[in-house]
């Protein structure tokens, strides 16, 4: 069964401070998921991250210390995909409307939606404050980054027989060792400047032949645009 890939990067590196200006932290008393700023008033995350009350934290690097660039904005609307399946994690995407627009600057900025889907082999940047250990747990204060390629559909499906839908992509390394993990859920996979994935699920973290599975954002551009227009 899928286990929520919900909190941290294994085998990555500490991102340069504020170098991922579209990365947000979803907070409900503490960090619980990531997200991506797609316009000044909307964030995209994973539907399995849903909570009824969410504070969006932007401009973060060290989530445990006030460093001066943060913006904390409560969610006004939280909209999960109407066809989200909590068992299979199909359609694992959610939109959050901020109660007021974020102030955009060098440390808080939007990421583009995909203009087309990403080909296998495309290198992407995954980021988050999730667990940094594949066994045991260690949650970082500083945002972690990982460069990883989009895997072919065939290797993705052979890693997870019967569990990969057309709305999922695998990104990572079949040899293991580098992956997103618990606490990274909802966060971005950005390839060539476009948001191509949302951290969704996986079997453990950084295990051999069990790469991370991500929501295939290119399938949802119309839904995102229509939902924003209607809300």
Swiss-Prot record:
Give any Gene Ontology cellular component.
Answer: extracellular space
Q: Where is the Peptidase S1 domain?
A: 9-229
- UniProt keyword annotations, A-Z: Calcium, Digestion, Disulfide bond, Hydrolase, Metal-binding, Protease, Secreted, Serine protease, Zymogen
Q: Where in the chain is the site Required for specificity?
A: 179
Q: Name one GO molecular function term.
A: metal ion binding
What residues make up the catalytic site? Answer: 48 (charge relay system), 92 (charge relay system), 185 (charge relay system)
Q: What is its EC number?
A: 3.4.21.4
Q: Lineage of the native species?
A: Eukaryota, Metazoa, Chordata, Craniata, Vertebrata
Q: What is this protein called?
A: Trypsin
Task: Give the record's GO biological process terms.
Answer: digestion; proteolysis
Entry cofactor note text? Binds 1 Ca(2+) ion per subunit.
Using the chain's own numbering, where are the disulfide bonds? 15-145, 33-49, 117-218, 124-191, 156-170, 181-205
Give the InterPro entries listed for this entry.
Answer: Peptidase_S1_PA, Peptidase_S1_PA_chymotrypsin, Peptidase_S1A, Serine_Proteases_S1, Trypsin_dom, TRYPSIN_HIS, TRYPSIN_SER
**Catalysis performed (reactions):** Preferential cleavage: Arg-|-Xaa, Lys-|-Xaa
| Keyword Chaperone in record | no
Q: Which family does it belong to?
A: Belongs to the peptidase S1 family.
Reported cofactor(s): Ca(2+)
Quote the record's binding site residues for Ca(2+).
Answer: 60, 62, 65, 70
| Record PROSITE patterns | TRYPSIN_DOM (PS50240), TRYPSIN_HIS (PS00134), TRYPSIN_SER (PS00135)
Question: If you read the UniProt record, what top EC class would you report for this enzyme, in one word?
Answer: hydrolase
Could you tell me which Pfam families the record lists for this protein?
A: Trypsin
Q: Which residues form the signal peptide?
A: none
Propeptide per record: which residue ranges? 1-8
């Amino acid at each position: 069964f899928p286990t929520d890939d919900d909190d941290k990067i294994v085998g990555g590196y500490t991102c340069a401070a504020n170098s991922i200006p579209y990365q947000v932290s979803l907070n409900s008393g503490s960090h619980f998921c990531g997200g991506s700023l797609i316009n000044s008033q909307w964030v995209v995350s994973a539907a399995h991250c849903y909570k009824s009350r969410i504070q969006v934290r932007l401009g973060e690097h060290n989530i445990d210390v006030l460093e001066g660039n943060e913006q904390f904005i409560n969610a006004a609307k939280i909209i999960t995909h109407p066809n989200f399946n909590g068992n299979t994690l199909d359609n694992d995407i959610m939109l959050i409307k901020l109660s007021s627009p974020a102030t955009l600057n060098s440390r808080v900025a939007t990421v583009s939606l995909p203009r087309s889907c990403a080909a296998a082999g495309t290198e992407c940047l995954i980021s988050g404050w999730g667990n940094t250990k594949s066994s045991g747990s260690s949650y970082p204060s500083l945002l972690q980054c990982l460069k990883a390629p989009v895997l072919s559909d065939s290797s993705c499906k052979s890693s997870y027989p019967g569990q990969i839908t057309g709305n999922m992509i695998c990104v990572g390394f079949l040899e293991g060792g580098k992956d997103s993990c618990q606490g990274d859920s909802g966060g971005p996979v950005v390839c060539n400047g476009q948001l191509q994935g949302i951290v969704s699920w996986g079997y453990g973290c950084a295990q051999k032949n069990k790469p991370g599975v991500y929501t295939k954002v290119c399938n949802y551009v119309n839904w995102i645009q229509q939902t924003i227009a209607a809300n």
